[in-house]
Amino acid sequence: MNDFQKYLSTAPVLLTLWMTFTAGFIIEVNRFFPDMLGLYF
């Protein structure tokens, strides 16, 4: 169990989880508020 916890705390695993969360968040924001990635002045 200690090795599994050490594996989950490594950088590639944390980076993958963070990028998955970020991509999902951006997708959901764009679903409810489309075309907000471009800034229109």
Curated annotation (Swiss-Prot):
For this entry, the protein name equals Photosystem I reaction center subunit IX
What are the recorded Gene Ontology BP terms?
A: photosynthesis
Instruction: Tell me the superkingdom of the source.
Output: Eukaryota
Q: Which UniProt keywords apply?
A: Chloroplast, Membrane, Photosynthesis, Photosystem I, Plastid, Thylakoid, Transmembrane, Transmembrane helix
Membrane-spanning parts: 7-27
One GO cellular component, as annotated: photosystem I
Function as written in the Swiss-Prot or TrEMBL entry: May help in the organization of the PsaE and PsaF subunits.
User: Where does this polypeptide localize?
Assistant: Plastid, Chloroplast thylakoid membrane
Q: Which family does it belong to?
A: Belongs to the PsaJ family.
Q: How does it sit in the membrane?
A: Single-pass membrane protein
Q: Which InterPro entries match?
A: PSI_PsaJ, PSI_PsaJ_sf
Q: Which Pfam families match?
A: PSI_PsaJ
Name the gene for this chain.
psaJ
Say if the entry is tagged with keyword rRNA-binding.
no
Q: What is the lineage of its organism?
A: Eukaryota, Sar, Stramenopiles, Ochrophyta, Bacillariophyta
